[in-house]
Each structure stands twice: as C-alpha cells, then as structure tokens.
C-alpha cells in the first residue's frame, strides 16, 4: 500500500531539497503547499507582501488544501506521495499570527492524515543565512521563525493530536550537516519506521 509522507519545518531548514530527494529515492510523486493551482498562486502573492486579513489567508490555505487532498488521494492509488508542507504548516504558522487553534482545525477538518511526518530542525541563525539569497516572505523574520519552531514542537508533544500521523514524527536536525548527510539520516529513519517502503 502506498504511503503519504509530509516534510515540515521552519523556512531555511532544507525541507524542499530533502523532500525532492526522498521522493526521487522512493519513486514517489512530489507535491507541495501552497499548490500551483489558482488558489495556491493567490496565496503566494499574499505571502510576497500583498495585503490580506490573517483569517482570509487561513481560509485560502484551507481551500487550496481541499484541491490538494483530492489530488493526493487520486495519486496514492499509483504511488507514494511526498509533500513539501501540509496542514501542520497551517496550524503553526497561523497560530503564530494569533488565529485560534480550534478555528484552524475546523476549516481543515477534511485534511487526510499522513502516514509519516518528517520535521527538519535547524539553528535559527543558520536558517536565516540560508534564506539570505531568497525573496523575503511575510513569515521570514527571526522572531516569527522562533515562534513557529516552538509551535512544531508543541504540536508533536501534544496528546490526542488531531492530525497525528500513523507512524508518528521523525525529527532530524540539519544544522551544520551536508545535504547528503541529512538525506541518509532521513532515509534510514523512514525505513526504520516503514521497512517495506522501498520495494
């Protein structure tokens, strides 16, 4: 049976790079949020600095996820899926803006629970160095990234978490490690959790 694996972490943790590498190694379909659909493109514009109420942005993310989940369920019939970000990003990023957790959970109620979540951690200063060459998005400020990092750990440690993955969470620290080192750690941890994932 095909598996749905999600990569999460603060900006600059190496998540997109590793998600793509793992997808390739597992012969999985790579996907991401926000998606490249119409709603996802609107979200990207807002993240680049367009004005928008925080609740509106939360609802847009949830609407984009409706489309994404539909595609994930279809694609899971054919292969494993690896997603760069998912509902956990909405929970921690939007809570960092003061949106109540219950509101975020309610609007994401339909979200499919993944089999496994890989959380990549990184020292905040190293994350900022990695992001220096990128265009800045509204969430890419050190105070916000610190809040988001704390939010991820709070989410992982909470009991009866609504979106608790079937095989739980894997946490990998990417600080001062090469791309290959991190990749090997992630792959070994995934195989340890789901031994039959590699055919």
From Swiss-Prot:
Leading EC class: transferase
Pfam families per the UniProt record, alphabetical: Thymidylate_kin
Keyword S-adenosyl-L-methionine in record: no
GO MF annotation: an example: ATP binding
GO CC field: cytoplasm
Catalysis: reaction(s): dTMP + ATP = dTDP + ADP
Amino-acid positions noted as binding ATP in the UniProt annotation, renumbered to this chain: 9-16
Alphabetical keyword list: ATP-binding, Kinase, Nucleotide biosynthesis, Nucleotide-binding, Transferase
Gene3D superfamilies per UniProt: P-loop containing nucleotide triphosphate hydrolases
Listed EC numbers: 2.7.4.9
GO biological process terms on file: dTDP biosynthetic process; dTTP biosynthetic process; dUDP biosynthetic process
Keyword Nucleotide-binding among record annotations: yes
Protein family membership: Belongs to the thymidylate kinase family.
Name of the protein: Probable thymidylate kinase
Annotated organism of origin: Methanococcus maripaludis (strain C6 / ATCC BAA-1332)
């Amino acid at each position: 049976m095909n598996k749905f694996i999600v990569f999460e972490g603060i900006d600059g943790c190496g998540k997109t790079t590793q998600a793509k590498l793992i997808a390739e190694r597992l012969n999985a379909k790579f996907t991401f949020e926000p998606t490249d659909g119409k709603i996802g493109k609107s979200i990207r514009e807002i993240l680049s600095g367009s004005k928008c109420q925080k609740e509106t942005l939360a609802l847009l993310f949830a609407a984009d996820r409706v489309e994404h989940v539909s595609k994930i369920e279809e694609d899971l019939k054919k292969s494993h899926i690896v997603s760069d970000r998912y509902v956990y990003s909405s929970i921690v990023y939007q809570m960092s803006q003061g949106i109540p957790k219950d509101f975020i959970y309610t609007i994401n109620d339909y979200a499919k629970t993944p089999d496994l979540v890989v959380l990549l951690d990184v020292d905040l200063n190293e994350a900022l160095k990695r992001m220096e060459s990128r265009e800045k998005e509204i969430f890419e400020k050190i105070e916000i990234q610190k809040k988001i990092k704390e939010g991820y750990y709070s989410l992982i440690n909470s009991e009866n978490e609504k979106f608790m993955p079937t095989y739980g969470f894997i946490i990998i620290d990417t600080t001062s490690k090469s791309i290959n080192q991190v990749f090997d750690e992630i792959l070994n941890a995934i195989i340890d959790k789901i031994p039959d994932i590699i055919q």
